[in-house]
Amino acid sequence: MTSTSQLFDPYAEALMAIAREQGLEDRFGEDAALFRSTLAASADLRHLLENPTLFSSQKKAVLNQVFGSSVHPLVLNFLNLLVDRNRIAFLDGIADRYQALLRKLRNVVRADVSSAVPLTEAQVQVITEKVKQLTGAAGVEIESQVDADLLGGVIIKVGSQVLDASLRGQLKRISISLAA
């Protein structure tokens, strides 16, 4: 069975090669973010693109209508190529992989932050600086989400590293040490 990275990587790498050739890495990254947010917001669009009974011309027409004026023409051509190769259903994964390649190119890390309450700008700044110190990255992309089960504090995930500074995590560690 083919792993998803074997499906996503060649297309994401090809898109990155075109972007680098044209000096449009960041623009294509913005387009990839637009794809991901649009697909996340529209289940109908996702289902339409995944529908094997629709003709390629119909899918291309929808993509042109939805993204045509918003994305770079080379990116629109790329979308049409994905339709022609029956890979358009993998657009979200390809866009995610492209963004990962862009972060690597720019020496930027992604930090997934869970907190009990929404983070303030000051808290985001502190977390950004701390992650930069820990990773040596030039920049940090913060993806935050609220998890009321944490009670307080934050959990920060960067790659395979996890920093648990939550009240729930502290209580769990105390419980384990008391049980020992």
From Swiss-Prot:
GO MF annotations, alphabetized: proton-transporting ATP synthase activity, rotational mechanism
Topological relation to the membrane, as annotated: Peripheral membrane protein
InterPro entries, alphabetized: ATP_synth_OSCP/delta_N_sf (IPR026015), ATPase_OSCP/d_CS (IPR020781), ATPase_OSCP/dsu (IPR000711)
Tagged with keyword Transferase: no
SUPFAM superfamilies found in the cross-reference section: N-terminal domain of the delta subunit of the F1F0-ATP synthase
Superkingdom of origin: Bacteria
UniProt keyword list: ATP synthesis, CF(1), Hydrogen ion transport, Ion transport, Membrane, Thylakoid, Transport
GO CC term, one of those recorded: plasma membrane-derived thylakoid membrane
Leader sequence segment: none
Cellular compartment(s): Cellular thylakoid membrane
One Pfam family per UniProt: OSCP
UniProt cross-references to NCBIfam families, sorted A to Z: ATP_synt_delta
Subunit structure: F-type ATPases have 2 components, F(1) - the catalytic core - and F(0) - the membrane proton channel. F(1) has five subunits: alpha(3), beta(3), gamma(1), delta(1), epsilon(1). CF(0) has four main subunits: a(1), b(1), b'(1) and c(10-14). The alpha and beta chains form an alternating ring which encloses part of the gamma chain. F(1) is attached to F(0) by a central stalk formed by the gamma and epsilon chains, while a peripheral stalk is formed by the delta, b and b' chains.
Biological role stated in the UniProt entry: F(1)F(0) ATP synthase produces ATP from ADP in the presence of a proton or sodium gradient. F-type ATPases consist of two structural domains, F(1) containing the extramembraneous catalytic core and F(0) containing the membrane proton channel, linked together by a central stalk and a peripheral stalk. During catalysis, ATP synthesis in the catalytic domain of F(1) is coupled via a rotary mechanism of the central stalk subunits to proton translocation. This protein is part of the stalk that links CF(0) to CF(1). It either transmits conformational changes from CF(0) to CF(1) or is implicated in proton conduction.
Entries under HAMAP family matching the protein: ATP_synth_delta_bact
Family designation: Belongs to the ATPase delta chain family.
Stated name of the protein: ATP synthase subunit delta
